[in-house]
Amino acid sequence: MTDTFPHAHDITGSGPVLLLAPGGAGHPMGLGPLTERLAARFTVVTYDPLGLAHGRLGRPVAEQRVADWSEGAHRVLEEVLPPGESAYVFGTSSGGIAVLDLLARHPGRLAHVVAHEPPCVTLLPDGARRRAELIDGLDGPEPPPAEGGSATPMGVFLAHVLRPFTAHAPGFTAPPGRLTVAAGADSRGQLLYDTAHLLADRLNGAFAEFPGGHLGTLEHPEEFAALLTDTLTRGSPTTKEPRTVRTTG
């Protein structure tokens, strides 16, 4: 484990390197069961971009930038990757946005990237409205604190991550066979399922369904880890036929 902020990370397991980028404000809370299963196959490097699990929760946090998270992830990989080897990468939610940007900026040593329900909703038809609805649905009248002794990772996410990250609109072309954009089976018909499908089509990736919903990593860690391992090590699953993204309202 290293406490060096802003590139804090934890390492467990053995095998090829797999970088995990958690969602929310990057705190890896709840990912233990998933990490434990993945560690049987990979050297799992869990990235903590703000150091929230490494003693910095409650300290002041600036407005976050996607590029800062992806560059931090790149530096972590440069530190932990053995010479000549490539890394597998998984990110969910805001972490999914960060790993897409990582692939756009530094594709050279990435074997395969899986981005799970990245909320790049501005790419959808009427994306500005959909983004505003998403923010309104998460941002209640009394959000949890982002600083001080009672600060929570959710408070940090709402105050400093949600708005800049949901404004991010990736526009690169992924190297063939090296990107999968995933959504939960329980998310069918919902905003982030549509977003994942559109991203896979636009970025030259494959689309895959994973167990559970947006929190499938927490809800079904065993099944999620098994499918993630298969997707990473065997390449992109069969891409579903492109479909028209719905707008509502």
Please name every model-derived segment:
Residues 49-87, 199:
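Active-site loop/oxyanion-hole signature of alpha/beta-hydrolase fold enzymes
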Residues 48-52, 119, 211-213:
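Short beta-to-alpha linker loops that shape the active-site pocket of alpha/beta-hydrolase fold enzymes
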Residues 118-166:
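Helix-rich cap/lid subdomain of alpha/beta-hydrolase
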